[in-house]
């Protein structure tokens, strides 16, 4: 069984994971529809306008903590010999809440009002948005931790 935490220690792999995380996020944002989709797209447009490359840098900065939070779920998935997509989707709320512990803590320490405002706009639906991303997220985890 592969460990996400161990995989990220490889300096050749880490940038690939970061790039794939950014692609996954872009795809999820592009898929959003309706009023909430407009809000999500607007929030991310604001974030990207504040500092180009911020999303990639943020993923790189958070990746070790994200891996630590997700790795127990991945290990359970592997122990159960479960289909990663099925496992991650069925555990999406627990995984989302584990990941949000990281970002909630970070946003409390942020000095950037625009980022705080954008996060506050998205946070009420964050568990749902992360849950929507679980199939792609499971594919990403499988790609690197298998």
Whereabouts are the PLM-identified features?
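Amphipathic alpha-helical binding modules
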Residues: 98-145
């Amino acid at each position: 069984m592969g460990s996400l935490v161990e995989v990220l220690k490889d300096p050749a792999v880490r940038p690939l994971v970061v790039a794939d995380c950014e692609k996954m996020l872009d795809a999820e944002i592009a898929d959003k529809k309706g009023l909430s989709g407009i809000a999500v797209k607007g929030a991310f447009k604001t974030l990207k306008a504040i500092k180009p490359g911020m999303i990639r840098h943020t993923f790189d900065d958070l990746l070790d903590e994200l891996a630590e939070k997700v790795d127990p779920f991945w290990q359970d998935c592997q122990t159960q010999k479960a289909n990663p997509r099925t496992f991650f989707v069925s555990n999406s709320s627990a995984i989302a809440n584990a990941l949000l512990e990281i970002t909630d803590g970070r946003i409390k320490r942020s000095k950037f009002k625009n980022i705080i405002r954008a996060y506050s706009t998205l946070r009420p639906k964050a568990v749902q948005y992360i849950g929507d991303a679980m199939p792609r997220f499971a594919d990403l985890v499988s790609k690197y931790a298998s």
